[in-house]
């Protein structure tokens, strides 16, 4: 692929983007099908033309199995359907229909989590049985998160009550104990905008629709561990991610910056920061990003860590890959377009 950065091909605007569990690959849904890329070095591995738009795509680990949902101005499939696609056969192997539009999905080795407008369905892959259906608050953006570790099944979503989240462990699911292994807590005063579990599912980061404060909780009891201030003005939070070592948290917003927060520095400086913040009238919050990456395009994006690097893909198909945390600055920043 050519190493240039362009958004001139607007007709190829990305409809959806997602990383697999270890960020080795990412998937994009397009107006005419979908593509799969290897993250580093950036290379195209799958290019499927389907004569219709794919609005949601999720890869199972590093396999040829994908979840597909239609999208765009000419959807390939009805928006209330989810298809299981086997790319080794280039065909669908299973189809699910729902009473409302599918807004998001997460696929693991044993289970699929399908988020509709006002419900979540958990499906067992072995026999495609529906294990549980959860009625939820209206969730037009499909807000949810799942632990990326293939052996863990912690799943999180917004609760019925504004500002609350629910977390449940589906690793050992028993039909007779639906409400066991579930935690509920109010984490913001306003509506939930983003939630993100770390790799092993022992931490969760949250942001509200105000976008000023990012909070990190442990998932054992939802005790608050960290609070970070992204800024003083409201912002739309596009994406949140942890690095695999739980040293850093990245936050992308519509303020043309991707902030990096140090979880380790926050722990070391917590006493000092809290004391100082009380003096200057900021309550318990003063911790700011240790570095940030300027974003030339104010376009919705998805971010993920890959080793010591941060990856950003936006809806124009532009891809940024940068080594970070070297003297609190980004180094070796590379930009590309998935349409080249």
Feature locations, PLM:
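Beta-strand-rich domains and repeat architectures in extracellular enzymes and scaffolds
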Residues: 3-35, 51-64
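Asp-box/WD-like beta-propeller blade repeats and closely related beta-sheet repeat scaffolds
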Residues: 89-149
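Canonical WD40 repeat/beta-propeller blade segments in eukaryotic WD-repeat proteins
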Residues: 9-18, 53-58, 100-106, 136-148, ...
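Beta-propeller domains
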Residues: 22-50, 65, 69-88
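Terminal intrinsically disordered, low-complexity extensions flanking WD-repeat/beta-propeller proteins
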Residues: 13, 33, 48-55, 59-62, ...
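Conserved loop/turn motif of beta-propeller repeat scaffolds
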Residues: 22-23, 63, 109-111, 150-152, ...
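Hydrophobic beta-strand positions that form the internal "hydrophobic ladder"
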Residues: 26, 66, 112, 155, ...
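Per-blade loop-tip surfaces of WD-repeat and WD-like beta-propellers in eukaryotic adaptors/scaffolds
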Residues: 37-45, 81-91, 119-137, 158-192, ...
């Amino acid at each position: 692929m050519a190493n240039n950065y362009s958004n001139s091909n607007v007709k190829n605007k990305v409809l959806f983007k997602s990383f697999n569990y270890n960020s080795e690959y990412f998937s994009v849904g397009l107006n005419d099908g979908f593509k799969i890329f290897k993250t580093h070095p950036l290379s195209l591995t799958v290019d499927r033309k389907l004569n219709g738009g794919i609005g949601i795509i999720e890869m199972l680990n590093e396999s040829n199995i994908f979840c597909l949902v239609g999208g765009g101005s000419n959807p390939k499939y009805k928006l209330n359907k989810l298809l299981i696609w086997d790319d080794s056969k280039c065909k669908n192997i299973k189809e699910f229909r729902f009473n409302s539009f599918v807004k998001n999905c997460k696929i693991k080795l044993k289970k699929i989590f399908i988020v509709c407008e006002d419900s979540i369905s958990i499906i067992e892959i072995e026999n495609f049985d529906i294990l549980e259906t959860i009625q939820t608050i209206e969730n037009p953006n499909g807000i949810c998160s799942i632990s990326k570790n293939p052996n863990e099944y912690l799943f999180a979503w917004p609760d019925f009550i504004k500002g609350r989240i629910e977390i449940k462990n589906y690793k050992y699911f028993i039909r007779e104990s639906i409400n066991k292994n579930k935690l509920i807590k109010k984490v913001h005063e306003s509506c939930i905008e983003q939630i993100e579990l770390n790799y092993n599912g022992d931490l969760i980061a949250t942001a509200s629709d105000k976008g000023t404060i990012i909070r990190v909780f442990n998932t054992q009891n939802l005790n608050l561990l960290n609070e970070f201030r992204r800024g003083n003005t409201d912002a739309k939070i596009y994406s949140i991610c942890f690095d695999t070592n739980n040293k850093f948290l990245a936050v992308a917003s519509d303020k043309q910056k991707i902030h990096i927060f140090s979880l380790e520095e926050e722990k070391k400086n917590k006493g000092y920061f809290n004391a100082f913040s009380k003096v200057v009238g900021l309550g318990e919050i003063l911790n700011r990003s240790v570095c940030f990456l300027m974003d030339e395009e104010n376009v919705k994006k998805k971010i993920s860590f890959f080793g010591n690097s941060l990856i950003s893909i936006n809806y124009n198909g532009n891809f940024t890959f940068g080594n970070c945390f070297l003297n609190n600055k980004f180094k070796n920043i590379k930009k590309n377009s998935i349409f080249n």
